[in-house]
Amino acid sequence: MTLDKLIEKLAAKFRIVITKVAVKDHLAYKIEPHFLLPFLKALKESEELRFTVLTDLFGVDFPKKEKRFEVVYNLLSLKLNKNLIIKTHISEKESIPSAMQILSAAYWYELEVYDMYGVNFNGNNDKRRILTDYDFEGHPLRKDFPLTGYTQVKYDKKLEKVTYEPVNLDIEYREFDFSSHWHSPSYVLPGDEKTEE
């Protein structure tokens, strides 16, 4: 039996609804958040599959979608030497169940996804900022986060400490016009003959 058939059989056994999605060179499934933990547990404990290693967990922001955040789990079966991708989607106000009780590696990944996107994981109450500064405002990988941020960090020599100030730009935003004012030569350089039509 092929790997995708084994996974679909396992999902059916536990009445878990999964949808196969196209991801180049990988087997991937989309799942609703409430099915996530039972599915991860079944994949880990299945004697045939043994997806015991969480190699990555990350977020993706699609601000125009109703379920804005996609949370992606990359699993590895050492028994089969195969990878599996599990995707789930949540809106900005929803939270997702923490996978750290099933896959302990999820702990740090969940902190990172919270820090970068603001996605809350039920069961992981640690809200430390591990990639941004302690007083950082917002979540920098959201597509609506301003390029300049909200505050700038400076070392104040008089106070002898780091201070946070609102962003103050000395110049206006520049519009980058990539059209060149330089003109190409009217003759063809050796090797460029193929570009001529």
Swiss-Prot record:
The species this protein was found in: Rickettsia prowazekii (strain Madrid E)
UniProt cross-references to Pfam families, sorted A to Z: Complex1_30kDa
Topology of this chain in the membrane: Peripheral membrane protein
Function field: NDH-1 shuttles electrons from NADH, via FMN and iron-sulfur (Fe-S) centers, to quinones in the respiratory chain. The immediate electron acceptor for the enzyme in this species is believed to be ubiquinone. Couples the redox reaction to proton translocation (for every two electrons transferred, four hydrogen ions are translocated across the cytoplasmic membrane), and thus conserves the redox energy in a proton gradient.
Disulfide bridges in this chain: none
Gene Ontology molecular function, alphabetical: NADH dehydrogenase (ubiquinone) activity; NADH:ubiquinone reductase (non-electrogenic) activity; quinone binding
Gene3D superfamilies membership: NADH:ubiquinone oxidoreductase, 30kDa subunit
Gene transcribed to yield this protein: nuoC
Keywords, alphabetical: Cell inner membrane, Cell membrane, Membrane, NAD, Quinone, Translocase, Transport, Ubiquinone
Name of the protein in question: NADH-quinone oxidoreductase subunit C
